[in-house]
Amino acid sequence: MSASTAPLDGVLLIGAGGLGCAVALALAGLPITRLVIADDDRIALSNLHRQILFTMRDLGAFKSDTIAMRWGAQRPDWSVTTLRARLDTPEAIAEVARHQAVTIDASDNFATRFAANDAAIRHRFPLVHGAAIGLTGQLLTIDPGRSACLRCLFGGPPEAEGTTCQNAGVLGSLVGEVGWLMALEAVKLLYRTGRPLWNRLLTIDALRGRRRAVPLRPDSHCACQLQPGSDPP
């Protein structure tokens, strides 16, 4: 794969935490014309074990700004835009995503994950989803009209957030693994090559060293399989 000939375009990265750091680091080696990073959070001491682009000197700074600085230092000729905002509605996400080739959801909450899913369904753009908690991770690539989405799999977000990295912890190296795999999915979409994780949920059990691609079947009644512009239930 030649970086000089690959016709890549922009990427929207939602979330600048552990997954977002790993994704951004992996993408920095690609000839992407622009990267948009959206996150409203600031760097805390408890983040450093898994958010590998941050140091003690960065405490209190915005995560999105710090990743942009690191990314820009490696690729100063590329465009990096930061949004100090939490994109947690389909409308807010779609407004930014429609200008990019691929959207990557590296968020850490169900509201944003399903908002990204619903925006992708409604506006028909490709979405890479990933999550990690404790010693387990998961990965799914969504192509509305062609593959299953989060609502096909889970129906909708839970009523409460429940287990999070803040209250349950997460293995830093697992976050890195999931983030790099998310970047690899974005590469497949941008280069239009390989076999993205359409209709397959990749699960990772770090404790047992197991990966499993679980086959998925799209829900024929889900909005992702209906006409463009359809709204999720």
Place the predicted regions along the sequence by residue:
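Adenine nucleotide-associated cytosolic modules
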Residues: 1-233
